[in-house]
Amino acid sequence: ASALAAAGACLAAGMFTVLHHPVPGPRVSNLAAARLAGPVAAPSPATGSAPAAAADPRKGVAAWNFTGARKALRLSGASWFYTWAAGPNGISAPPGARFVPMIWGSGSVTSANLAEAQRHGHILLGFNEPDMASQSNLSPSAALSLWPKLQATGMQLGSPAVAFGADQPGGWLDRFMKGAHRRGYRVNFITLHWYGGDFRTAAAVRELKSYLQAVWQRYRKPIWLTEYALTDFGASPARYPTWSQQAAFVTASTAMLERLPYLRRYAWFALPSNSTDGTVGLYRSGARATAAGSAFRLAPGR
């Protein structure tokens, strides 16, 4: 399916930020649509010649296949990537970048997918935005009923990645984590998404840090931030910062994330870019860096 066709299926999958709490709103971006669409073909213009960045242990990207994906991964300095699936969806990882599998939703909990995930290491990401009707759309109790199958893989498990409100008492993640504790289920780390609608660099970095800190204080478990960027999904259509604003946020947020001892990994949303998706993508077809991509490549590591 094309990204445009899949965009309708992903309507309302995003959020914007008020203070440090992401709030749901309509996500219409083609980038977000790829979480359901899978690999996206693209034309192949001339490529740039920027040197590859040194891979950072925490730095990662959310990705789907496109022309130049392998080269873009290498140039970005990402040490890991995921595709919202149990397998890499045709992306060939360059040296220094490892694929991390995900079990996306209830329909993904199959013997074949679990076996595929086990072939890709010892870490498994849980369900994608189960609190959103347009994403995996699972109640906490439904997710808990499936969790033993993920646990049986013996892999390190990331919690379901809620779209918003991970720090809220009585929220989706809070109910899931309490249920897991009562049942004696294993959750090794918390997985989060965050999108900011305040495009001022310092304010956005503060909001993201505040959200992460609140989630850490609630669960006291390591955190993986597996989607983040500046995008106001509360606007219709979605509102994006300028390239320079997005690039400034990439630089400042990465520096902040690298200083958080409980933040084990982070993944920018997303590796690919096209003309209809605002300023969030890092690389255009052919591995040509955007302003955000150049900033991500140069962002300091530990």
What are the residue ranges of the model-derived segments?
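Secretory targeting and sorting signals
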Residues: A1-H20
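Aromatic-rich peripheral "rim/lid" segments of glycoside hydrolase catalytic domains that contact
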Residues: G8, F16, I91-A93, R98-G105, ...
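N-terminal low-complexity, Pro/Thr-rich disordered segments
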Residues: M15-P57, R302
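Structural recognition of the beta-strand scaffold that forms the well-ordered cores
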Residues: R58-A63, S79-W84, R98-I103, H122-F127, ...
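Aromatic- and acid-rich polysaccharide-binding/catalytic face
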Residues: T83, N128, L173-A214, R218-A235, ...
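Active-site clefts of carbohydrate-active enzymes
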Residues: G158-V162, A166, Y219-A248, F269-R284
